[in-house]
Amino acid sequence: MSGVRRLSRLLSTRRLALAKAWPAVLQTGTRGFHFTVDGNKRASAKVSDSISAQYPVVDHEFDAVVVGAGGAGLRAAFGLSEAGFNTACVTKLFPTRSHTVAAQGGINAALGNMEEDNWRWHFYDTVKGSDWLGDQDAIHYMTEQAPAAVVELENYGMPFSRTEDGKIYQRAFGGQSLKFGKGGQAHRCCCVADRTGHSLLHTLYGRSLRYDTSYFVEYFALDLLMENRECRGVIALCIEDGSIHRIRAKNTVVATGGYGRTYFSCTSAHTSTGDGTAMITRAGLPCQDLEFVQFHPTGIYGAGCLITEGCRGEGGILINSQGERFMERYAPVAKDLASRDVVSRSMTLEIREGRGCGPEKDHVYLQLHHLPPEQLATRLPGISETAMIFAGVDVTKEPIPVLPTVHYNMGGIPTNYKGQVLRHVNGQDQIVPGLYACGEAACASVHGANRLGANSLWDLVVFGRACALSIEESCRPGDKVPPIKPNAGEESVMNLDKLRFADGSIRTSELRLSMQKSMQNHAAVFRVGSVLQEGCGKISKLYGDLKHLKTFDRGMVWNTDLVETLELQNLMLCALQTIYGAEARKESRGAHAREDYKARIDEYDYSKPIQGQQKKPFEEHWRKHTLSYVDVSTGKVTLEYRPVIDKTLNEADCATVPPAIRSY
């Protein structure tokens, strides 16, 4: 013990000597740490039993609350705090565990570092990639803002990969072209090797520490607090201690990510459960285009782990059992860098026609071993590691077995390009006061029927920032927060109590697996009416089985059984809208490929001159957005439709891209 005391005294003496040697500015103590995670301990918080004596509620008041702390949520939250708004951020995960961390490939922006480029060419590629279901005003906004967004990230300290002369390195990615599709392959994708999402999320998280945002970490958002058709905050469950919190705010931003876990095989984290999408549904508001689910061409066979499109951007090729580079037959110009929906369908056809690989002939190969080992080591280090761990493959010597895997949800909460959530009434869009959405949870719609690779990370940053700017334009810090009823959130607490004591016959895990396998079997890469109809029936039945659930943990402290059951409820609402929307859409467009309706059905036949053609009525064509609603008590799905926005923000500066036959 005496030795320990002597060592302690010695270290203290050295620290004192070092402190005296520091400049005076550094002797004022540690840097202020603004990442406030004890949101429930704020002096302004008030406890009441206005809902139930069994579930006391802690009430909070903020100028704005952001739900979700991935790339979009963080950018919205610190953007609001930077503008002076008293901001809360509610997240069921610590921010750096959000699924943004898993993105690999990069961020598209027309910087022109590898060759001449123009954001208008990027605009054209994105409209074409969307199969003309994207709203061109939002696409205009996003592509024009992209270069500035990348520069902003660089200024925040994001360590982009570099060219030899020090510029941000840009790789080729699918569906990207020069000169409006006539100038060959574009190199537009800015990256940090193959760990771009990881770098982006940590960069934004680091930036967020500069601002006084109150983070409610490991709080599960249950529902929106709606009064008089406007949003006034959220109600959330503190997972750590089981307390209920009502966070009242003048503005609410939903940034909860996608719902990939409705499917059995997907690249999404197990926490991608469509929580925000489901909250919108329970609030009686519509979701948009949920039938458009992207299957990434290269998930590791058997594991579903993502292998970035950046592999093909660096020169990787897809081959079948005959060693043929088969994409040359399906996309003669773009080949392996065609858009994701085209590549996934081509792979599926190769397997169907008997040219699959392996003993079961049920996958294809991604070949990288023809590339220089130093290129693999510097540009694709994470992929080399992932392939070894999950496929047992040394990418310098053998190909990776891959299969299309659910990766992204193009649909979500309908918004305009400012991030304001929309409802559609009597043929007109109406803004829902106080409610915003961004990231994969939202549908602006910049991706339409198919998202181009490397267009999502930039979507997070641009529209997270747009939400903050929009709130800053319409409100001031300290504006009066509208009141809520004393029992606001009562239904959410009743539902939580019901699930906590659920004593049926079906485990949450069993019902979730049945839903995931049904979605995988009935709404996959290729779809057909009879199978979709069967799937609608199965998912509806499974939704009804929610009332037969059995939970086992009756406590309130770290009750993960309860949280997973709440997530299952959310997934079911997303699954219902996805499969009913797919069954109703009698055409093939982007990621929605119907074998019984193989043509894209527009208002005109764009394979021919439109002069002399009669425009189809709105109800007779499918170039329109699906709006879906669910009666939560019965599971009945109702569908409506709203027109696609073709006008840009400034036709003189960026002309509308008219629909055309889409080929690569």
From Swiss-Prot:
UniProt name for this protein: Succinate dehydrogenase [ubiquinone] flavoprotein subunit, mitochondrial
Cofactor(s) this protein cannot do without: FAD
Function: Flavoprotein (FP) subunit of succinate dehydrogenase (SDH) that is involved in complex II of the mitochondrial electron transport chain and is responsible for transferring electrons from succinate to ubiquinone (coenzyme Q). SDH also oxidizes malate to the non-canonical enol form of oxaloacetate, enol-oxaloacetate. Enol-oxaloacetate, which is a potent inhibitor of the succinate dehydrogenase activity, is further isomerized into keto-oxaloacetate. Can act as a tumor suppressor.
Catalytic activity, as annotated: a ubiquinone + succinate = a ubiquinol + fumarate; a quinone + succinate = fumarate + a quinol; (R)-malate + a quinone = enol-oxaloacetate + a quinol; (S)-malate + a quinone = enol-oxaloacetate + a quinol
Location within or outside the cell: Mitochondrion inner membrane
EC top class, as a word: oxidoreductase
Xref: InterPro entries: FAD-dep_OxRdtase_2_FAD-bd, FAD/NAD-bd_sf, FRD_SDH_FAD_BS, Fum_R/Succ_DH_flav-like_C_sf, Fum_Rdtase/Succ_DH_flav-like_C, SdhA/FrdA/AprA, Succ_DH/fumarate_Rdtase_cat_sf, Succ_DH_flav_su_fwd
Regulation of catalytic or functional activity: Enol-oxaloacetate inhibits the succinate dehydrogenase activity.
Keywords for this protein: Acetylation, Electron transport, FAD, Flavoprotein, Membrane, Mitochondrion, Mitochondrion inner membrane, Oxidoreductase, Phosphoprotein, Transit peptide, Transport, Tricarboxylic acid cycle, Tumor suppressor
